């Protein structure tokens, strides 16, 4: 069996559909200010380390070269996430959904836009009143179903996601338009929050 690991930096955004409150920061400053979706098209987004939006989704694309002639046994995707409120709010739930190749892979109801203490990695200029950290969530696609943090969420097999069929693997993170808790998303890169990682995909295949 072989393993592939693909870290995907936050700035490599392919499809954007977001609404305020929203924004992007890098390790130095805000990119184009806050609450302006146009900032997601600024060339400086290539330095993004934290992105947030109240509604909508972002889509990332991962390579699938090398698995076309094999059998994928497992896909694991991990990211640090939380809800998005103005500043931060410990009572702000959000139903955050992951889609893989346009197929739903499970929803996590985040309880909070976390704050009250500084994120372990946050730069000094990031104000205490802002979102500080998230939770590291892990989605796993197995042959017998899909799991979130080790708990089975549906019976969709890893083969049902058709990972090798297209030229890439689509990963979409967002909040459904009809979600019960429409509390937005904060998505942390390797220089904000508590975990020194970007979005990471791991594939086990043979």
Segments and roles (model prediction):
Residues 39-52, 110-164, 181:
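Extended, solvent-exposed segments with strong compositional bias
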Residues 98, 169-173, 201:
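Hydrophobic beta-strand residues in large extracellular and virion-surface proteins
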Residues 174-206:
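Proprotein-processing/basic-patch segments
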């Amino acid at each position: 069996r072989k393993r592939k690991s693909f870290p995907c930096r936050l700035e490599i955004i392919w499809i954007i559909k977001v609404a305020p409150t929203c924004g992007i920061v890098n390790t130095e400053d805000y990119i184009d200010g806050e609450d302006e979706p146009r900032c997601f098209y600024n060339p400086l987004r290539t330095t993004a380390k934290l992105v947030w939006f109240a509604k909508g989704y972002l889509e990332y694309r991962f390579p699938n070269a090398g698995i076309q002639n094999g059998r994928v046994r497992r896909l694991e995707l991990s990211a640090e996430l939380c809800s998005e409120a103005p500043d931060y709010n410990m009572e702000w739930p959000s139903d955050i959904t992951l889609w893989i190749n346009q197929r739903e892979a499970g929803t996590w109801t985040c309880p909070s836009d976390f704050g009250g203490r500084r994120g372990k990695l946050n730069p000094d200029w990031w104000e205490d009143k802002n979102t500080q950290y998230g939770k590291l969530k892990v989605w796993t696609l197995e042959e017998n179903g899909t799991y979130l943090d080790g708990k089975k969420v549906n019976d969709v097999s890893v083969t049902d996601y058709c990972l090798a069929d297209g030229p890439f693997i689509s990963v979409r993170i967002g909040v459904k338009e009809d979600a019960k808790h429409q509390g937005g998303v904060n998505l942390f890169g390797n220089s904000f929050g508590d975990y020194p990682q970007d979005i990471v995909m791991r594939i086990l295949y043979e």
